Amino acid sequence: MNIKPEEITSIIKKEIEKYEKQIKTVDSGTIIQVGDGVSRVYGLDDCMEGELLEFPNDVYGMALNLEQDNVGCVLLGNEEGIKEGDIVKGSGKIVEVPVGEALIGRVVNSLGEELDGKGPINTNQTRPIEVKAPSIIDRSSVNEPLQTGIKAIDSMIPIGKGQRELIIGDRQTGKTALVIDTILNQKGKDVICIYVAIGQKQSTVAHIVNTLTEMGAMDYSIIVSSTAADSAPLQYLAPYAGCSIGEYFMNQGKDVLIVYDDLSKHAVAYRTMSLLLRRPPGREAYPGDVFYIHSRLLERAAKLSKENGGGSLTALPIIETLAGDITAYIPTNVISITDGQIFLESDLFNSGQRPAVNAGISVSRVGGNAQIKAMKQVTGTLRLELAQYRELAAFAQFGSDLDKDSKKRLEKGKRLVEILKQDQYKPLEVEKQVIILYTAVNDFLSDIKVEDIKKFEKELLEYVDTHYRELGRQIAEEKVLTDEIKAKLEVAIVEFKKIFLQEA
């Protein structure tokens, strides 16, 4: 076989022309210490704060401390098999979570990985967990109500779409029950609900998933779970991940409700990480920026302006207090960040008033603008009447003889307190709340025994539903109590009361 030297030369020239001289550079470092979910890495000269790092065994980490000669990282997975001397690579990205419609009805962890055994999540869209909050220009004022279905809240402490309303109270006062009822009440209202469980028991999360599934609420809900068994870094990331998932829907013009249960455990997880990274401790051993971790999370809740799609993200953070102490560090921080708080009291809870809302110190700073006019008309004096009742009840304990007017107020107060009680998993539509509260506030219950109030309420709603169905529809549509509606309503109440008193 005869090969000409020119042919060989041309083949070699072609191969040289084809050759692409590309050098792939990776910022890498060496582990000098690992343990307790944190690691120190030497090298990583171009590392950024919050950057996602690749450790051996498919474990990821996040850079938090950028020091002169090393980088302090937290591990977002199991540290088994990771040892001193291993190579760590920088990714140039920050932590992202999958977002999209595919997440609805699913249970995921802080990194968006499925936990419910229903197979992988089919979405190719991701979003960084840390995003800048919408600016003042991008927002509009809170002007639409978010109905919780709970009489005590929708009447006196109304919540608007895009608001941040803190739910605060001791353990076992019904904080989670209150938010689950709120989620159940969003059925058919085109609101996507996200429940973020931080440091909860796995059994508690499983119970919540079962409840929402049974009630048909998982069709519009997402659960982000980071249980007590997860590491502190994963618990720390959970609320930010949930918030990013919610923002995706908000940016599409949808309404989203997100619950953080609870931020006390979130602060404890951050404190654990900070102390392990040897950051200087401050008050109650929390690091100096513990206020900032909550403020930057809750500032992402917003009602967007029409130009930006008009979507909203309403946040209900939960804080657990110790012996009702709302002056502790984390409770005061979160109270100052949010637009109001609902305070739940163990004394009220134990005395049978559930939901155990203390109307005296609970407040909604912006929700009043969002409350429907019909509810405003009905409950204008409700808070004042309850306050007067509490004062009189305390005075009456001393057995003093009360005048006729005071006795009347006392009796009315008892009935108002009774009417505000509500069973769990039974949220009420706003028009039904208006009917019930109108009855109570306008003295239609004065001749009904206190112990019969619950029965009266249930049967009155059934009666109105059967004989005056258009009344509820009118209130829901017009959102205001016209003289015509009031007259019809009073006729219905008087008619039913006659029947009820005859049966009694």
From Swiss-Prot:
Q: Which GO terms describe its molecular function?
A: ADP binding; ATP binding; proton-transporting ATP synthase activity, rotational mechanism
CC annotations in GO: plasma membrane; proton-transporting ATP synthase complex
- Entries under InterPro entries matching the protein: ATP_synth_asu-like_sf, ATP_synth_asu_C, ATP_synth_asu_C_sf, ATP_synth_F1_a_nt-bd_dom, ATP_synth_F1_asu, ATPase_a/bsu_AS, ATPase_F1/V1/A1_a/bsu_N, ATPase_F1/V1/A1_a/bsu_N_sf
Where is the protein found, in the record's own terms?
Cell membrane
- Enzyme Commission code(s) on record: 7.1.2.2
Query: Which residues are listed under the site Required for activity?
Result: S362
SUPFAM superfamilies given in the database record: C-terminal domain of alpha and beta subunits of F1 ATP synthase, N-terminal domain of alpha and beta subunits of F1 ATP synthase, P-loop containing nucleoside triphosphate hydrolases
Broad EC category: translocase
The job of this chain, per UniProt, is described as: Produces ATP from ADP in the presence of a proton gradient across the membrane. The alpha chain is a regulatory subunit.
Family statement drawn from the similarity comment of this UniProt entry: Belongs to the ATPase alpha/beta chains family.
Instruction: Return the protein name.
Output: ATP synthase subunit alpha
**Species lineage, top-down?**
Bacteria, Bacillati, Bacillota, Clostridia, Eubacteriales
| Gene name tied to this protein | atpA
